[in-house]
Amino acid sequence: MSIKSDKWIRRMAQEHGMIEPFVERQVRGADSSRVISYGVSSYGYDVRCADEFKVFTNIHSAIVDPKNFDEKSFVDIKSDVCIIPPNSFALARTVEYFRIPRDVLTICLGKSTYARCGIIVNVTPLEPEWEGHVTLEFSNTTNLPAKIYANEGVAQMLFLQSDEACEVSYKDRGGKYQGQTGVTLPRT
């Protein structure tokens, strides 16, 4: 398995629609103001967070159960910023829609800008032939409120290409998150 370069990422996005919308260079500023970078980097793609958030709340004193998840555990927010309460959690989604090739596994890592502020981004691997908007999980590990910026970089995708295509892809087995759009809650 080898990590793929900016040239490969650019080609796959432009010729095969692997990432849409696609930004073919790294953006660090917009309209004379600094932003948290997004777009193609040397060996990855920095994704942006859309302006749709679900912030974890304890208003209804629900129990967090991944097999029987109560949507009332979240408050929906549509904004250019999201404030995550101390020691809490929020979900969002990428601006970008992904179509992962059959011989590629994609790993997502949080950006250091957020990690150095105590904000952890978690995403499980994007499996071969998975497609959709990526649901992003943000954990605020601090005892202070934390801010997430929509339409700016939040995580980096690394593309690992195998020597051979897998026998059974995510699409083949009818994965439960295939084709997801919007912020997607747990499914069983």
Curated annotation (Swiss-Prot):
<feature type="binding site">
    <location>
        <position position="170"/>
    </location>
    <ligand>
        <name>dCTP</name>
    </ligand>
</feature>
<dbReference type="GO" id="GO:0015949">
    <property type="term" value="P:nucleobase-containing small molecule interconversion"/>
</dbReference>
<keyword id="KW-0547">Nucleotide-binding</keyword>
<feature type="binding site">
    <location>
        <begin position="135"/>
        <end position="137"/>
    </location>
    <ligand>
        <name>dCTP</name>
    </ligand>
</feature>
<feature type="active site" description="Proton donor/acceptor">
    <location>
        <position position="137"/>
    </location>
</feature>
<comment type="pathway">
    <text>Pyrimidine metabolism; dUMP biosynthesis; dUMP from dCTP (dUTP route): step 1/2.</text>
</comment>
<keyword id="KW-0546">Nucleotide metabolism</keyword>
<keyword id="KW-0378">Hydrolase</keyword>
<comment type="similarity">
    <text>Belongs to the dCTP deaminase family.</text>
</comment>
<dbReference type="InterPro" id="IPR036157">
    <property type="entry name" value="dUTPase-like_sf"/>
</dbReference>
<dbReference type="GO" id="GO:0006226">
    <property type="term" value="P:dUMP biosynthetic process"/>
</dbReference>
<feature type="binding site">
    <location>
        <position position="180"/>
    </location>
    <ligand>
        <name>dCTP</name>
    </ligand>
</feature>
<dbReference type="Pfam" id="PF22769">
    <property type="entry name" value="DCD"/>
</dbReference>
<protein>
    <recommendedName>
        <fullName>dCTP deaminase</fullName>
        <ecNumber>3.5.4.13</ecNumber>
    </recommendedName>
</protein>
<comment type="function">
    <text>Catalyzes the deamination of dCTP to dUTP.</text>
</comment>
<dbReference type="GO" id="GO:0006229">
    <property type="term" value="P:dUTP biosynthetic process"/>
</dbReference>
<feature type="binding site">
    <location>
        <begin position="111"/>
        <end position="116"/>
    </location>
    <ligand>
        <name>dCTP</name>
    </ligand>
</feature>
<dbReference type="GO" id="GO:0000166">
    <property type="term" value="F:nucleotide binding"/>
</dbReference>
<feature type="binding site">
    <location>
        <position position="156"/>
    </location>
    <ligand>
        <name>dCTP</name>
    </ligand>
</feature>
<dbReference type="InterPro" id="IPR033704">
    <property type="entry name" value="dUTPase_trimeric"/>
</dbReference>
<dbReference type="InterPro" id="IPR011962">
    <property type="entry name" value="dCTP_deaminase"/>
</dbReference>
<comment type="subunit">
    <text>Homotrimer.</text>
</comment>
<dbReference type="GO" id="GO:0008829">
    <property type="term" value="F:dCTP deaminase activity"/>
</dbReference>
